Amino acid sequence: MSRRRVYSEGTLAIMERFYQAMDACKAEKLISISDYCKETDIEKPHYYMQRKDRNRGFFEVGWMLPLVEKYHISAYWLMTGRGQMFG
């Protein structure tokens, strides 16, 4: 069980964009949550617990890498919220 964390507003905003990007990729049928969790070694319960409670403490920056490298989500957009999601 992960300890609760108090993330900064900036980190919470990045986390929110991560989940927005995941939803967009899922809607476009580019990924499934199960497959994404397997390929990134995210424990699926941690993915869902973190989504439900942003201060859960499971989130890692590495969760975003395949979105950028494989699914062409803009790293600039993930970090800043500016520009287009797909880059």
Regions inferred by a protein language model and the residue ranges of each:
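Pre-recognition alpha-helix immediately N-terminal to the DNA-recognition helix
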Residues: 17-21, 46, 63-66
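DNA major-groove recognition helix of helix-turn-helix/homeodomain DNA-binding modules
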Residues: 60-77
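Short, charged recognition helix plus adjacent turn
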Residues: 1-9, 76-87
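Recognition helix of helix-turn-helix/homeodomain-like DNA-binding domains
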Residues: 41-59
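Conserved hydrophobic/aromatic packing and binding residues within compact polymer-binding modules
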Residues: 36, 47-50, 78
